[in-house]
């Protein structure tokens, strides 16, 4: 691994594990075959760039190659060269890059197959596009074809392995949430070589079934997509927290919470008639949206004294928040602007890490270093450059404080609105419905 790649990986690790995520978990790292083994990692796609970075940062002994959407390679020749240096390969899609561009996938498949033959590790997302919900989409057989064709090029002398994996997020769109990467059991293609020689499609179908079953079993797969929002509300509501606590799940234990959520979703799926439950849940969801609050604000039931003390505290911290506007505002605003331009909320985290943390923060750091250093030198300050360096090194802490202050303000206003809701007639009606939903859920979970 060259120095540029190691520098990139180290900086990304600092920005993701140290700044972006509250906690990261990795389960089954011992299942990753040793370096030099041809491995194709197949994973669900629950986010955009963040998914790839999760695998990049949990496999430390080798350079991992990723097959990702091609549009980022088309920005400039420099971008194409840089991304390939990092191990990324472009996948062209008919609905994005056009029918003519799809033929370029031949080169990507060739490069990926050659990487496997050389004993390297390739990561692919068989769903092609990322999901916006906890659900496993349809798989393309492109990844199984790639693995078998790589084996065929070696005369079936090398055992290509497919490693099912999954990623799971405590929340998709919020900052300082948690990420879980889980590796399953490697699947050897060697037992399928003879079948592939006579019935290639059948061999691919059988392997795909095994891969998909493993990924589905590791992740939270809410298959009832039509009622997803209602199910997700129940899962993330105060009831979901209570249910997790009854399972012995700690507050920040994402792997255990995932298993608890899977049990809860399975209990709902086992019910024959949930139409009324889901209808009532959606009524609560729509009410909370209308009032611009979340279930957690209702659950907290903040007192007037708590609200007043928090308001005073935030007021006292406001001068510090004002001082932290630079570089925080461009670091937070640019990704939000770009995400809104795409119309895809899943890019929020990707742009925050991929643009702000990796590029914008470095550029702003250089600009600030030069401006402060030369500015203080011009004013005759004796230690101008050490001050400038110290200021730039504090950028991550400055950004975290600014985010925390804004987050505290947002939650304070939500809690204030929740107090108002609790005092209103329609709010009390909603609370009764909410408790009735939780009561029905208690009965469902106890019957399982």
Language-model features: locations:
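Soluble catalytic domains of membrane acyltransferases
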Residues: 2-202, 320-448
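Short, well-structured alpha-helical interface segments that form or flank functional binding sites
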Residues: 142, 206, 314
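Transmembrane alpha-helical segments and their cytosolic interface motifs
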Residues: 296-330
């Amino acid at each position: 691994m060259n120095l540029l790649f190691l520098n990139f990986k180290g900086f990304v690790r600092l920005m993701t594990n140290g700044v972006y995520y509250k906690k990261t978990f990795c389960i089954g790292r011992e299942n990753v075959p040793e370096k030099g083994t041809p491995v194709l990692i197949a994973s669900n796609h629950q986010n955009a760039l963040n998914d790839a970075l999760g695998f990049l940062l949990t496999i430390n002994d080798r350079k991992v190659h990723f097959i990702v959407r091609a549009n980022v390679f088309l920005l400039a020749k420099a971008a194409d060269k840089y991304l390939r240096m990092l191990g990324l390969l472009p996948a062209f899609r008919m609905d994005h890059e056009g029918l003519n561009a799809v033929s370029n996938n031949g080169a990507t498949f060739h490069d990926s197959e050659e990487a496997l033959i050389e004993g390297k590790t390739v990561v692919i997302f068989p769903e092609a596009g990322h999901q916006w919900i906890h659900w496993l989409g349809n798989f393309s057989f492109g990844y199984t074809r790639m693995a078998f064709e790589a084996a065929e090029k070696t005369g079936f002398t090398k055992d290509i392995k497919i490693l099912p994996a999954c990623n799971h997020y405590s929340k998709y769109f919020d900052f300082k949430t948690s990420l879980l990467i889980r590796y399953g059991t490697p699947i050897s293609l060697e037992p399928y070589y003879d079948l592939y020689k006579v019935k290639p499609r059948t061999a691919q179908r059988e392997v795909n079934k095994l891969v998909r079953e493993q990924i589905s079993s590791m992740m939270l797969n809410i298959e009832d997509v039509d009622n997803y929002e209602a199910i997700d509300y129940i899962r993330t509501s105060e009831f979901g927290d209570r249910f997790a606590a009854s399972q012995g799940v700690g507050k920040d234990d994402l792997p255990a919470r995932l298993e608890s959520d899977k049990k809860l979703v399975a209990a709902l799926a086992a019910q024959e008639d949930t139409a009324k439950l889901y209808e009532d849940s959606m009524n609560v969801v729509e009410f909370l949206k209308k009032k611009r609050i979340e279930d957690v604000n209702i659950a907290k039931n903040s007192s007037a004294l708590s609200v007043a003390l928090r308001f005073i505290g935030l007021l006292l911290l406001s001068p510090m928040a004002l001082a932290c506007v630079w570089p925080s505002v461009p670091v937070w605003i640019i990704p939000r602007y770009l995400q809104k331009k795409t119309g895809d909320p899943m890019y929020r985290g990707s742009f925050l890490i991929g643009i702000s943390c990796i590029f914008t923060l470095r550029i702003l750091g250089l600009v600030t270093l030069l401006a402060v250093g030369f500015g203080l030198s011009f004013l005759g300050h004796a230690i101008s450059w050490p001050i400038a360096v110290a200021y730039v090194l504090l950028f991550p802490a400055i950004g975290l404080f600014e985010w925390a202050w804004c987050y505290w303000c947002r939650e304070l206003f939500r809690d204030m609105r929740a107090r108002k809701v609790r005092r209103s007639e329609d709010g009390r009606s909603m609370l009764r419905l909410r408790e009735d939903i939780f009561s029905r859920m208690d009965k469902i979970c106890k019957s399982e």
